[in-house]
Amino acid sequence: MLSREFLTENIDHIEKIADEIDAEDLSLLLEMLSSKIDLERYSAFLALKFKSEKSDMLYSHWDSLVKRMRDENSYQRSIGIMLISENVRWDKQEKFDDIVDEFLSHCEDRKFITSRQTVQSIKN
């Protein structure tokens, strides 16, 4: 079972750590995405991003990613957008079809960084 401390202290090895993430770790990682501590939030984001490249484990939390994409906070919007992008590959239920216009609207987000991250995430 992962801990906040382990993730933040081992951020340089997060891609390898992501390979070991199991379903029990997801709730902690999703909670950490809302952390006010940048290193915690970023560690959780990276772990989930790398896990999503190889596994559909996060796809069952699709609705929480969409909720983040709709958040007032630009950090949360960016996290939601980038993780949605990583999980579209697992979208057998075609949930992305329901949000594609909203997703693409963030190419013109009021925060430039969110716009940039949306455009960059389209390649996934």
Per-range role (PLM):
Residues 7-11, 23, 38-39, 74-75, ...:
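Alpha-helix N-cap/helix-start positions at coil->helix boundaries
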